[in-house]
Curated annotation (Swiss-Prot):
It comes from Homo sapiens (Human). Keywords: DNA-binding, Nucleus, Transcription, Transcription regulation. Residues 178-201 are annotated as: Disordered. This is ETS translocation variant 3-like protein. Residues 39-120 bind DNA. GO terms for molecular function: DNA-binding transcription factor activity, RNA polymerase II-specific; sequence-specific DNA binding. SUPFAM superfamilies: Winged helix' DNA-binding domain (SSF46785). GO terms for cellular component: nucleus.
Length: 361
C-alpha cells in the first residue's frame, strides 16, 4: 500500500553540517531520501540534527563530538512515526530501538545525562563498510616503492591492524621463499647464443605476473567480502637521501632482448653511495619490500633481512666467470652489469664483493 506520509528532514548534504563538526560523507545512504521508508533510525536522527528547524527538538551537545540531546522525546517519536507510517509510535518504542544500537555499538547513552546519546562513528565505519573518502597515509614499512600497478583499496579502520600484521607475515614468507630458491644455486649460466631458449636464472620482477607484494594482492580475500571498495593513488615515496646511489639494470644476468616480455621491466638496485660510512652499512631489520611502478621509472627495492645489512668486502678477481652470482658484485660506481663476453663497465669491480645475509633472521 502506498504511504501518504509527509517527508521529514532534507537530503543528505555533507556541506550543510553544523560548523565545527566534521562527520563522514557515508552518514546517509542512497535510500535515505525524503519520504523513503527504508531508513534506519540513526540515519533519521542525523537528518533531524542537520536541519535547523528541529533545533528545539534535538540538537548536538556543545563541545562533544557526536553527542546529541533529545530535547522533546515525544516530538521526535512522532516525527519518526510519520516517517515510518506508524502513528502509534511513542518514545518508549523509540528508546527500545535505540537500545538495539547499544549492542551494535553504533551509539550509546551518555551516563548521567538524560535523553543524551553519543554516536560511535569509528564503529559505524566497520559496521556499514562504507567508502572512506580520504587518502590514508601509507605505512613507511609497506609503501616504500613507486605507485603500484594494482592500486590498493581502502579498508575500514577496524580491520587495518589485523591486515597490517598479516601483510608483514606474508612479506617475510615471500622473503624466505626467494632466499631459499637462490641459496642452493651456483653461478647462473646464460644462454645468449641460443635464441628462443629460456634461461634458468630466477629474475626478480621480470615476469609480468600479478603483483605479489602489493597491498591489493594481500587483501584479495577481503576485497571479495567488502562491497565495491574504491581505489586511490598512493602518494609518491619520500625523496631518497643524497648518499644513495641508483644502479641501473638488474643485478642478475639479463635475458636476451628477443626473450624480453612486453610486460617486463628492468628493476633498479638502490645501494648506499661511496659517501656513506665504510665497512658494513646498517639497515633496520625490515623485510623485503618491492614497489612495482609504471613506465620507465619502475624500480625494485631490496632491503636487507637482518640488521647487519649489506657488507662490502675486498675479494679476488672474478671476471673469469661467465655469469654473475646474485651474492656477488655490487658497486656504487657501476651503472650496468653485463654478462658473457662483454666487459664490465668499471674496473673497480675486480676488488669488491658484496655479501648478502641470506639466512632469515
Amino acid at each position: 500500500m502506498h504511504c501518504s506520509c509527509l517527508a521529514e528532514g532534507i537530503p543528505a548534504n555533507p556541506g550543510n553540517w553544523i560548523s565545527g563538526l566534521a562527520f563522514p560523507d557515508w552518514a546517509y545512504k542512497a535510500e535515505s531520501s525524503p519520504g523513503s521508508r527504508q531508513i534506519q533510525l540513526w540515519h533519521f536522527i542525523l537528518e533531524l540534527l542537520q536541519k535547523e528547524e528541529f533545533r528545539h527538538v534535538i540538537a548536538w551537545q556543545q563541545g562533544e563530538y557526536g553527542e546529541f540531546v533529545i530535547k522533546d522525546p515525544d516530538e521526535v517519536a512522532r516525527l519518526w512515526g510519520r516517517r515510518k507510517c506508524k502513528p502509534q509510535m511513542n518514545y518508549d518504542k523509540l528508546s527500545r530501538a535505540l537500545r538495539y544500537y547499544y549492542n551494535k555499538r553504533i551509539l550509546h547513552k551518555t551516563k548521567g545525562k538524560r535523553f543524551t546519546y553519543k554516536f560511535n562513528f569509528s564503529k559505524l565505519i566497520v559496521v556499514n563498510y562504507p567508502l572512506w573518502e580520504v587518502r590514508a597515509p601509507p605505512s613507511p614499512h609497506l609503501l616504500l616503492g613507486a605507485p603500484a600497478l594494482c592500486r590498493p583499496a581502502l579498508v575500514p579502520v577496524g580491520v587495518q591492524s589485523e591486515l597490517l600484521h598479516s601483510m608483514l607475515f606474508a612479506h617475510q614468507a615471500m622473503v624466505e621463499q626467494l632466499t631459499g630458491q637462490q641459496t642452493p644455486r651456483g653461478p647462473p649460466e646464460t644462454s645468449g647464443d641460443k635464441k628462443g631458449s629460456s634461461s634458468s636464472v630466477y629474475r626478480l620482477g621480470s615476469a609480468p605476473g600479478p603483483c605479489r607484494l602489493g597491498l591489493c594482492c594481500h587483501l584479495g580475500s577481503v576485497q571479495g567480502e567488502l562491497p565495491g571498495v574504491a581505489s586511490f593513488t598512493p602518494p609518491l615515496p619520500p625523496p631518497l637521501p643524497s648518499n644513495w646511489t641508483c644502479l641501473s639494470g638488474p643485478f642478475l644476468p639479463p635475458l636476451p632482448s628477443e626473450q624480453q616480455l612486453p610486460g617486463a621491466f628492468k628493476p633498479d638496485i638502490l645501494l648506499p653511495g661511496p659517501r656513506s660510512l665504510p665497512g658494513a652499512w646498517h639497515f633496520p631489520g625490515l623485510p623485503l619490500l618491492a614497489g612495482l611502478g609504471q613506465g620507465a621509472g619502475e624500480r625494485l627495492w631490496l632491503l636487507s633481512l637482518r640488521p647487519e645489512g649489506l657488507e662490502v668486502k675486498p675479494a679476488p678477481m672474478m671476471e673469469a666467470k661467465g655469469g654473475l652470482d646474485p651474492r656477488e658484485v655490487f658497486c656504487p660506481e657501476t651503472r650496468r652489469l653485463k654478462t658473457g663476453e662483454e666487459s664490465l663497465t668499471s674496473p673497480n669491480l675486480e676488488n669488491l664483493k658484496a655479501v648478502w645475509p641470506l639466512d632469515p633472521p
